[in-house]
């Protein structure tokens, strides 16, 4: 169903290429996961190009739980422990403790403050002491291997920003409908058309990555 609805946007490879081009230009992309999984669409931006206006959109148009996807080595470098010792969530979403920048924020809730926190966390020289805990940004630890290991939005985000040649850090939030329900693919496609954002799926990223591996092989 998802693939047929997305057929007008080209092949899986073409959809991923459109997403990578958007990220390189500092724009957002919409990624839908498998229909038999969450079947939700996330709005994703590269962390290094994230603007206050884009954060405001994430807060306004999405669930408000803005997450910062980071690879395992960055999570370890920042000494961010898992949110809980035993993760019993349905899909094993790897939340760490929430964070706040220690410098340059007020309450930490505003769009500008959340961007400041994200920029502090992704800085090349970032230290654990640069971040207070808890806060209003929710880091997610991506599994090594990306979507070929786990078909989640966290891994899809890291795969996309890396494939785009950007720093391995991305920001995501689940898109919601005006009535507060979760947006599914038809609504995600309409949202993408309204905001001129490409739409792709986790399966598309899997296909793209496997095609790259086949070329190497």
Curated annotation (Swiss-Prot):
Binding-site positions, Mg(2+) 2: 38, 153
A Gene Ontology term for the protein's cellular component: cytosol
Cofactor annotation remark: Binds 2 divalent metal cations per subunit. Magnesium or manganese.
Pfam families from the UniProt entry: DHBP_synthase
Record keyword Magnesium present: yes
Signal peptide start and end residues: none
InterPro entries: DHBP_synth_RibB-like_a/b_dom, DHBP_synthase_RibB
Cofactor: Mg(2+); Mn(2+)
Lineage top rank: taxon: Bacteria
NCBIfam families: ribB (TIGR00506)
Purpose: Catalyzes the conversion of D-ribulose 5-phosphate to formate and 3,4-dihydroxy-2-butanone 4-phosphate.
Annotated protein name in UniProt: 3,4-dihydroxy-2-butanone 4-phosphate synthase
Organism: Shewanella baltica (strain OS155 / ATCC BAA-1091)
Lineage: Bacteria, Pseudomonadati, Pseudomonadota, Gammaproteobacteria, Alteromonadales
Gene: ribB
